[in-house]
C-alpha cells in the first residue's frame, strides 16, 4: 500500500504534506502523548531566567516558538542548558539583571515571546532592546500591549504608529497601574503583570472574561505576591518581586491534543487514549464544546502535577451534533477554533461560532483561511464578522490547500483530510513545527 502520509520538500524551502487516507477504513487506536504545553513552556523559560537560583523544566516543548524564547533570553545573559524534553536547567540572573543584547532579539513566529518580553524589558532600567519577528509576527497588532505599558511609563517605539514590530524598547522605571482590558487576552495580562513585577506597588489587570491563568499559577510558585478576584475577573501583583527558581513539570498541550480528539471523533472505529494532558480549567473550552457536540470524551487518571491539573483523555468515534458557541467560552478555546470547525464539518446540523474576532489577528486570519481552505475540500462553511457558520454533512474531497504558514491551520486541514475522499496536499505544512514538531510522525504512528 502506498504511504498515506508524505512530507515533500518544495523548491521554495517550504514543505507540502500529502495525505491519502487508506481505502479501507482504519480507526485511530492506541495510546499517544502530545508535546509539552506551549504556554507553560514559554513562561517556565522566562521566569526561570529572571529568578534567582536554578529552575528545572521537565517536558519542555521543543517547538520553534519556545526555542525563540530560549534564544532571546540566552542573548540577555540567562544560562539555559541544551534544550530537550527530558530536563532543561535554567540559571536565573535576577529580575532586574537582564543584559543589553548585542543584536536584535528575534521572536520568530511567537506572539507570546514578543508580547511577554515587552512587559519584562520595559522595566529593565537604562538598557535598550530591539525586538522583531518573522513576516507573520511583524504584521500582528502590538498596540494592545504597548498602550497599557505606556501608561506605566514604558518607552516603546514601533512601525505604523507604534503598532507593529520591529520594536525599540528603552528600559525605564515603571509605575503600577490598574488596567481594564478591552479583551480577554492572557498575553496582554501577562505582559502587564511582568512589568508590574518591577514596579513599587500593586499592578492590577481587569478582564472582560477569564483568560488562561498559567502565568498566575507560575508567578505564585516562583514566590510573587499575587491575588485573584474572581468576581471582578482581576489579577493583582505586588512589586518589586523576588523570584526563586523552581522545578517545573510541563504537561501535554491540550491545544495539540485537540487535533486527535477531533480526529478520533470523526474517524469510524476509533478508540484513542491521549496521556498526560494539561486540563487547566481556563483551557478546557475545547472539551466542553466537543462534549456539547456529543463527542465521546472522558477524563481518566485526573491529578495535579506541579500546580497544574492533568488527565488522560479517552475519545471514541462519535456521531457529532451541531452547536452554537460564543461569549466567555471563546477565550478558553480560542486556539482550538480551527480544529473545532473541522469537527463541525462532520456534525449533523449547522454550527455557529460567535465572538471569535480575535482569530483574525492570529498567525493568519483564521476565520477567512478556514472558510476558504475547508471550503476547497467541499465543506459548507462561511465567514461571519466574528466567527464561522458550518453546516455539516457534506462529503469532503481531497484538494490542494494552503496553511498560510499557520501551524494550527496546517494541522486542522490534515485532520480533515483523514475523512476526505482522495488525496489532499497541504502547502507550507512545515508550519506545524511551531507547536508540534512530531505531528506527522504521530499521524504515521496512528494510521501509517
Swiss-Prot record:
Name the enzyme group at the top EC level. Answer: transferase
Q: Pfam families in the record, alphabetically?
A: EPSP_synthase
The pathway to which it is assigned is: Metabolic intermediate biosynthesis; chorismate biosynthesis; chorismate from D-erythrose 4-phosphate and phosphoenolpyruvate: step 6/7
Q: Where in the cell is it found?
A: Cytoplasm
Q: How does it assemble?
A: Monomer.
Q: Which residues bind 3-phosphoshikimate?
A: 38-39, 43, 185, 187, 335, 362
Query: Which PANTHER family does UniProt cross-reference here?
Result: AROM/DEHYDROQUINATE SYNTHASE (PTHR21090), PENTAFUNCTIONAL AROM POLYPEPTIDE (PTHR21090:SF5)
Biological process, per Gene Ontology? amino acid biosynthetic process; aromatic amino acid family biosynthetic process; chorismate biosynthetic process
* Superkingdom classification of source: Bacteria
User: Encoded by which gene?
Assistant: aroA
Q: By its UniProt entry, which HAMAP family does this protein fall under?
A: EPSP_synth (MF_00210)
User: Per its UniProt record, what SUPFAM superfamilies does this chain match?
Assistant: EPT/RTPC-like
**Source taxonomy lineage?**
Bacteria, Bacillati, Cyanobacteriota, Cyanophyceae, Synechococcales
Active site per the UniProt annotation: 335 (proton acceptor)
Q: Which positions does UniProt annotate for phosphoenolpyruvate binding?
A: 38, 111, 140, 187, 366, 408
CC per GO annotation: cytoplasm
Which protein family is named in the record?
Answer: Belongs to the EPSP synthase family.
- Function, please? Catalyzes the transfer of the enolpyruvyl moiety of phosphoenolpyruvate (PEP) to the 5-hydroxyl of shikimate-3-phosphate (S3P) to produce enolpyruvyl shikimate-3-phosphate and inorganic phosphate.
Which reaction does this enzyme catalyse, per its entry? 3-phosphoshikimate + phosphoenolpyruvate = 5-O-(1-carboxyvinyl)-3-phosphoshikimate + phosphate
Keyword hit for Electron transport: no
Q: What is this protein called?
A: 3-phosphoshikimate 1-carboxyvinyltransferase
Which of UniProt's keywords are assigned here? Answer: Amino-acid biosynthesis, Aromatic amino acid biosynthesis, Cytoplasm, Transferase
Q: Which GO MF terms are attached to this record?
A: 3-phosphoshikimate 1-carboxyvinyltransferase activity
Please give the positions of the paired cysteines in each disulfide bond. Answer: none
Q: What is its EC number?
A: 2.5.1.19
**Entries under InterPro entries matching the protein:** Enolpyruvate_Tfrase_dom, Enolpyruvate_Tfrase_sf, EPSP_synthase, EPSP_synthase_CS, RNA3'P_cycl/enolpyr_Trfase_a/b
PROSITE patterns linked to this entry: EPSP_SYNTHASE_1, EPSP_SYNTHASE_2
